[in-house]
Amino acid sequence: DLPEIQINFTPMVVKEEGKRATFSIQNFLNLGKAVIARGKSAIPGVQLDINLQQPKSVGSIKLSSSNPFDKPIIDPNYLSDQRDIEDFTKAFRHLRYITEQDAFKDVLNTEISPGSNIKTDDDIHSAIRNLTTTGHHPVSTCRMGNDNDKSAVLDNKFIVRGTKNLRVVDASAFPDQINGNINAAVIMMGEKAADIILDIPPLKREDPRETTI
């Protein structure tokens, strides 16, 4: 089976305001600068983030008008599928189990968020709904698929159906979510699309058992 969750460990706590974490790359870099300047964390602690690798909830992007310069209507539709809530809950409990091990006793003290008082499934579900945000790896908004797939925007050459030379080559072309971060897969897709556009034939398949180094 493929992994269902990814856990990110960050050696500092990103400050929160209200219910939503105020994480941004700039905030993270500022905290990093503070660590270097002061020789210690600006906000001492460790942050552990849970990422679902195969979320079941599906969002959408729709045109707001016929004007291509108007902003689209984006609905991430987070946690609309109850299975995501259940997967997050299992991951949350497992993460607590990890932090309770002897190896962490000398370095971890108080659970800042959502707090050690959050114990029941209902409380955990509420915390998940309040704290969940993007993992910055959205995919499949212009997905590739066969001619019989009405949800497929692109054909197998990355061309937008109904056009001749308009292609989309990025994570939105993924037919489905992959397990893990998308950077390497997007680079691979770009290389493949370049070969298709330049009409470069695929590499010959080789038997690794016959490859010499």
Walk through the language-model features, giving the residues of each.
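FAD-dependent oxidoreductase catalytic-site/capping-region signature
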Residues: D1-A185, A193-I213
